[in-house]
Amino acid sequence: MEKKSIAGLCFLFLVLFVAQEVVVQSEAKTCENLVDTYRGPCFTTGSCDDHCKNKEHLLSGRCRDDVRCWCTRNC
């Protein structure tokens, strides 16, 4: 009886491990690119994000430490 419960527990961990690996492999890679069309210094990430989504048709955008707008896209 104890061997069955240990085997069942091992099987459950194996299924969970395989399911987690499948999720990790299906994630898309993203890349950041500097935006040439954004004018002025980038202080608010919201305006950069709007620009990247609406004008560049990319995933998102953010202001980085160099006060420039960087857009995120799928690689």
Swiss-Prot record:
Localization, UniProt: Secreted
GO cellular component annotations of the record: extracellular region
SMART domains: Knot1
InterPro entries to which the protein is assigned, alphabetical: Defensin_plant, Scorpion_toxin-like, Scorpion_toxin-like_sf
Main location: secreted
Top-rank lineage group of the source organism: Eukaryota
Region forming the signal peptide: 1-24
Keyword Disulfide bond: yes
Entry's transmembrane regions: none
UniProt record, GO biological process: defense response to fungus; killing of cells of another organism
A Pfam entry, by short name: Gamma-thionin
S-S pairs: C31-C75, C42-C63, C48-C69, C52-C71
Keyword Signal on entry: yes
Keywords recorded for this protein, A-Z: Antimicrobial, Disulfide bond, Fungicide, Germination, Plant defense, Secreted, Signal
Similarity annotation: Belongs to the DEFL family.
Summary of the function given for this chain in its UniProt record: This protein is required for germination.
Protein name, UniProt field: Defensin-like protein
